[in-house]
Regions:
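Acidic, low-complexity intrinsically disordered tails
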Residues: 1, 588-620, 624-626, 631, ...
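Acidic/polar, glycine-rich intrinsically disordered N-terminal extensions of enzymes
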Residues: 1-98, 106, 247-256, 577-582, ...
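Active-site cavity-forming subdomains of large catalytic enzyme subunits
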Residues: 7-15, 101-318, 322-326, 349-353, ...
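Core structural elements
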Residues: 17-25, 76-92, 186, 335-346, ...
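Catalytic alpha/beta core of large soluble enzyme barrels
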Residues: 19, 282, 288-291, 340-345, ...
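Gly/Pro-rich turn-and-neighbor structural signature
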Residues: 54-96, 100-104, 109-111, 232-239, ...
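A structural-propensity feature for long, helix-poor, extended segments
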Residues: 141-180, 310-344, 348, 469-511, ...
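Internal maturation/activation junctions in enzymes
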Residues: 332-355, 359, 380-442, 513-516
Length: 643
C-alpha cells in the first residue's frame, strides 16, 4: 500500500489499546506489506489518519504550522479513544486507495441505462470500500409495458436481485462483502412482493430492506382504511390496498426474521433543507441511519461518551450520581466536526457524480458510542426516565456545539455550496454542513475504543471466548460489572460462568437490586424502553439513528406492531427490530442457558459463513445483533461497513 505522507511514529500510552483491540486493528486496519505483514502500530495508524485529514487545512489558507496543530488535536482525540472515525477513514486515510466514507445512496432511474449505471456505480463504490443504498420507488411495476421495445417490465424485485448479484461479486475495499439497503415506498404497486422478497432466508442476502411510509399511511392503518397505490411511471392510481392488512404483513416479516424495517420518510424529510431544489430523500445507507439524496455520500465518526465520566462530590441537580466533563466533551465535539469536514476534501470518490453531490451539501455524521458504559459509571439504569433524560441532554448539547462549529467553519471556508438553494435562514443558519449528527452502529470501532456500541444497552455481562490454538475457553466479563461485583461482594467464578452461559443477573438472589437494574442487558430491556431511548436521542439528531429494538423469542406479532406504532408516534425516523432466534443461520450470542432465546448455527455453516465474510475469530465467534447490524465481539468482524 502506498502512503501519501510519511508516517511519523509517536510515543503512546499503550494502556489505551487493549489486547483484543490490538488483534482487531492488526487484522482489519493496520497497513500491510506485499507479503501481508503488518507495518504499522496503533500510534502510527492514528498519526497516518491525523496527518492526512489535518493537511486539508492548508487548502483553506492555513499555514503548515497551523495544520500541524490541527494534526496534533486530531491525533489526541483518536489516540485517547475519545473520537473514532468510521472504518474506511481508519483503513484508507493517507494511502492511495479506497474511500474515507462509508455511506452512499445511488439514484436508480427507470430505464435500462439508469439501472445499469446504478449497478456500475455500486460496484465502484463497493470496490472503494463503501456501502450503498437504493430507492426502488421510481421503477415501474412488474408487467408494465415498455414502449421503446414493446416488452414487459421485469419490475423492481428483479432489479434488486440483479444489484444483489453485482454486489456479491465485489469485496468492499478488499476487506468485506458488499452491504446494501433497498427502500420501497408503501405506495408502489409492487409493495407486497417487496415485503416478502427476503421471506426465504439467504435470498438477496447482501441487502437490508425497509419500507418507506408516511403519517398518512400510518393514520390509515389506525383507521383500518384503504389507500391508493401509485404507478411511479405515470403517477396514476394503480389500485388500492387495505393499510391495516399491509401493515400486518410488514409486522409479520419483521417478527419472522427482522425484515423489513420501516423508514418514516416524512419525518426524515423534515430535516431535508434542499428539498425544493434536489428533491426528497427516499433511501438510506445500508444500516438505515443516514438518509441521503441520490449520489450523496457521508462520512461518520463517533464520540466515546464513556471517556467523559467525572465523579461528583454530590448528586447532580438532574438526579445523577456523577457528572459529565462537559468542557472536554464540547472541545472534542468541535474537533470532531472539523475532522469530518476535512474528510470531505481528503476523500477519494468512486464517481464524479458522487463527488459533485457530496461536496454540494457537505453532509457529515457525528455520532456517539459508549452511552451504556457512561450510564453504568453514573449508576443510572438504562431502562429509566433518568437515562432518557441524560441521553436527551447529551445529544442536545452535542447538537448545539456541532451546529456552532459548523457555523464557525462556514465563516472561514464558506457555507455548503447548496446552502443558497436551501430553506435555512439566511441570517442565522449559515452552516458549512447541511446536516451534522448521525448515530451509527459502531460495532468494530467501539471494540477498538473498548466501549458499548452506539446508544445500545450492554448486550451481555459475560461471554465465552475460545482460543483454538491453546485449547482453552475463557470467560470475558464486562469490566465495570466485574469491578462492581468485586467491590460489593457478589463476585464469584460460578456467577461469571452462569452469565457466560446465558444466565440472567435478574435470577440471582445474592445480587443487589440496584445492580440488577444498572446492569440489565439488551435482551432484558423492554421493547418500549428501547424505542423511547431511540426517540430521546432522535429529537436533537438531524439525520437518523441506527438501533435495534430487541425482543425475546416469545414475543408476539402484536408486540412488534406496538413497537412500530410507538416509534412513529415518538418521532423516530426509522425502526429495526430483532426477535431472538428468528433467523435460521445465526451464531450463538450468549452461552447456552436458554436455547429458545438464542440463535444457533452448526459448525460447518459457521466456518463457511466466517470465511465468506472475512471473519477471523478462529472458532471463538461471539455474534451480537445490535444497531441493526451483526458484529463479532471476538474478532471485530461486522456486517456493517461503518462499524
Amino acid at each position: 500500500m502506498i502512503l501519501k505522507n510519511k508516517i511519523k511514529t509517536r510515543t503512546e500510552d499503550k494502556s489505551t489499546i487493549t489486547d483484543q483491540a490490538e488483534v482487531i486493528l492488526a487484522h482489519r486496519y493496520y497497513l500491510k506489506d506485499t507479503d501481508g505483514d503488518v507495518i504499522e502500530n496503533s500510534s502510527q495508524l492514528f498519526s497516518r489518519v491525523a496527518l492526512a485529514v489535518a493537511s486539508i487545512d492548508t487548502q483553506y489558507g492555513k499555514l503548515p504550522v497551523d495544520a500541524q496543530l490541527t494534526e496534533k488535536d486530531f491525533y489526541t482525540i483518536m489516540s485517547n479513544l475519545e473520537f473514532v472515525p468510521n472504518s474506511p477513514t481508519l483503513m484508507n486515510a493517507g494511502t492511495e486507495q479506497g474511500t474515507l466514507s462509508a455511506c452512499f445512496v445511488l439514484p436508480l432511474e427507470d430505464s435500462m441505462e439508469g439501472i445499469m449505471k446504478a449497478a456500475h456505480d455500486a460496484a465502484m463504490v463497493q470496490k472503494f470500500g463503501g456501502g450503498t443504498g437504493f430507492a426502488l420507488s421510481k421503477l415501474r411495476p412488474k408487467g408494465d409495458r415498455i414502449k421503446s421495445t414493446h416488452g414487459i417490465a421485469c419490475g423492481p424485485i428483479e432489479v434488486l436481485k440483479t444489484l444483489s448479484r453485482v454486489s456479491s461479486m465485489i469485496t468492499q475495499g478488499g476487506k468485506r462483502d458488499g452491504a446494501n439497503m433497498a427502500v420501497m415506498s408503501i405506495y408502489h404497486p409492487d409493495i407486497l412482493d417487496f415485503i416478502d422478497c427476503k421471506k426465504v432466508e439467504g435470498e438477496i442476502h447482501n441487502f437490508n430492506i425497509s419500507v418507506g411510509v408516511d403519517s398518512n399511511f400510518m393514520k390509515a392503518v389506525e383507521g383500518n382504511m384503504d389507500y391508493n397505490l401509485i404507478n411511479p411511471k405515470t403517477n396514476e392510481v394503480a389500485g388500492s390496498l387495505n393499510a391495516r392488512e399491509v401493515f400486518d404483513k410488514i409486522v409479520y416479516g419483521a417478527w419472522r426474521n427482522g425484515e423489513p424495517g420501516m423508514i418514516f420518510l416524512d419525518q426524515v424529510n423534515k430535516d431535508n433543507h434542499v428539498k425544493e431544489t434536489y428533491g426528497e430523500m427516499i433511501a438510506t445507507n445500508p444500516c438505515g441511519e443516514q438518509p441521503l439524496l441520490g449520489n450523496e455520500s457521508c462520512n461518520l465518526g463517533s464520540i466515546n461518551l464513556a471517556k467523559f465520566y467525572k465523579k461528583a462530590e454530590k448528586a447532580h441537580a438532574f438526579g445523577w450520581k456523577a457528572e459529565i466533563d462537559w468542557a472536554r466533551l464540547e472541545w472534542v465535539t468541535r474537533k470532531s466536526v472539523h475532522f469530518l469536514d476535512n474528510v470531505i476534501d481528503a476523500n477519494k470518490y468512486a464517481t464524479a457524480d458522487i463527488e459533485e453531490m457530496t461536496k454540494a451539501t457537505r453532509k457529515i455524521g457525528l455520532g456517539i458510542m459508549g452511552f451504556a458504559d457512561l450510564l453504568i459509571q453514573m449508576q443510572i439504569p438504562y431502562e429509566s426516565q433518568l437515562a432518557r433524560d441524560a441521553g436527551s441532554k447529551i445529544m442536545k448539547s452535542v447538537r448545539e456545539w456541532a451546529d456552532d462549529e459548523s457555523k464557525q467553519l462556514a465563516k472561514s471556508r464558506g457555507a455548503f455550496p447548496a446552502w443558497e438553494d436551501s430553506n435555512y435562514d439566511k441570517q442565522t443558519e449559515v452552516y458549512r454542513n447541511h446536516c451534522r449528527l448521525t448515530v451509527a452502529p459502531t460495532g468494530t470501532i467501539s471494540m477498538i475504543a473498548v466501549t458499548s456500541s452506539g446508544i445500545e444497552p450492554t448486550f451481555a455481562l459475560a461471554w465465552k471466548k475460545q482460543n483454538i490454538l491453546e485449547g482453552k475457553t475463557l470467560n470475558y466479563v464486562n469490566k465495570y460489572f466485574e469491578q462492581d461485583a468485586r467491590k460489593h461482594g457478589f463476585y464469584s467464578e460460578d456467577l461469571m460462568d452462569y452469565l457466560a452461559e446465558g444466565g440472567s443477573l435478574a435470577t440471582v438472589p445474592e445480587v443487589p437490586e440496584w445492580a440488577k437494574a444498572v446492569y440489565a442487558t439488551a435482551p432484558e430491556i423492554s421493547p418500549d424502553d428501547h424505542v423511547l431511548m431511540q426517540a430521546a436521542f432522535q429529537e436533537a439528531c438531524d439525520s437518523g439513528i441506527s438501533k435495534t429494538i430487541n425482543f425475546p423469542n416469545s414475543a408476539t406479532k402484536e408486540d412488534v406492531e406496538d413497537a412500530y406504532m410507538l416509534a412513529w408516534k415518538e418521532g423516530c425516523k426509522g425502526i429495526t427490530v430483532y426477535r431472538a432466534g428468528s433467523r435460521e443461520k445465526e451464531v450463538l450470542v450468549k452461552g447456552n442457558a436458554d436455547k429458545s432465546e438464542q440463535p444457533t448455527l452448526d459448525g460447518f455453516e459457521l466456518e463457511e459463513q466466517m470465511l465468506e465474510s472475512n471473519h477471523d475469530c478462529q472458532g471463538g465467534c461471539n455474534i451480537v445483533f445490535e444497531s441493526g447490524c451483526e458484529t463479532c465481539k471476538t474478532c471485530g468482524w461486522s456486517a456493517c461497513l461503518i462499524s
